[in-house]
Amino acid sequence: MSQEISTENFAGQVVTDVAAAISGVLTNIGHKKGLYKAMAGVGDITAKRLAAITQCDERYVKEWLNNQAAGGYVHYNQISDTYYMPDTHIPVLADEESPFFLIPALEVAASLWLDEDKLLDIFQSGKGLEWGEHHHRLSCGSESLFRPGYKTFLINDWIKSVEGLSEKLESGAKVADVGCGHGVTTILLANEYPDTHVIGFDVHNESIATAQSRSKESGTNGNLEFKVASAKNYSETGFDLICFMDCLHDMGDPVGAAKHAKEALNPDGVVLLVEPAAGDDVSDNINPVGRLYYGVSTVVCTPCSKSQEVGAALGAQAGERRLSDVMKEAGFSSIERVAETPFNIILAARL
């Protein structure tokens, strides 16, 4: 149970939230104008020097730096009137390949403000809202947010955490990436395992078109396909691995999707389920990560599920117990947690 605080202290908490919300715009500016990258690893820097490097207006840069210092993103030296970014902040603010790079989350937030009228409507009506009905910045921001984590963990951690899976993929196998979106994980798998045939499925036509374009740019060797299909109606079978990457909780009928995966899987195959990190009870998730995920779940994940058949609305904080129950109801006999990160839990399900 939360401890009550004074009205004054609670007002201060809300001021902190409002300041963070407004500062998110400045963080996005810092990313898009190269301000963070220009500060990374250079030590103390003046507003004038930073403005010259980035070809931005000095007065705006000075005010931006003061905001960043007030938020603790950079440090300020009053004596020299200089600013610097600690090395420990670089992976979060300036390194786009780091799994801790979080700036794209602000692109997601920006998209949701643009969807405000739609969200007000569904809160009243109880209707759903498909991913494709959101502003396009949602898909782009989500891809940029998830990509570094997938590149860091998918091949070297999650796949290798499932006994025998890496060896099977290296020798040649068949893989489905269900709900593949723009194809980040699909392309990673195809490039890493050239003797394995990988198929990405997604119900969203525009996402599949983007994935196909990315596939051509990636230089895969012909072992990769993308197809428009839902999680319950792709016709291919004989898969050694079926992946659900941060998407099962978005589906209207997760049990139906898991049942279809069971039917499409080889007897010794495995389903790899990547889901947002969450405890099994609400009280386990009363923390900043839980707050973030409950927020996204309220305005993205739950509406997405409610827009589909069944509308189970698992939400982005379903937790391992509920996810395991889904897989068991679908007919899987073995479900185990094989890996985790600060933001994800990874389950492997077998027949």
Question: Predicted segments — roles?
Answer:
Residues Q13-A21, T27-G30, K37-A38, N67-A173:
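Conserved Class I S-adenosyl-L-methionine-dependent methyltransferase catalytic core
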Residues D44-A52:
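Short acidic, hydrophobic short linear motifs in intrinsically disordered regions
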Residues C56-N67:
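Short amphipathic alpha-helical interaction segments
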Residues W113-H249, P254-G256:
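Conserved adenosyl
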Residues K174, G269-V270:
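Short glycine-centered segments of the SAM/dcSAM-binding site in methyltransferase folds
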Residues V255-P267:
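A short glycine-rich, Lys/Arg-flanked "PGG" loop and its adjoining helix->strand segment in the class I
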Residues V274-E329, E336:
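C-terminal alpha-helical "lid/dimerization" subdomain adjacent to the S-adenosyl-L-methionine
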Residues A330-L351:
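Core SAM-dependent methyltransferase catalytic element
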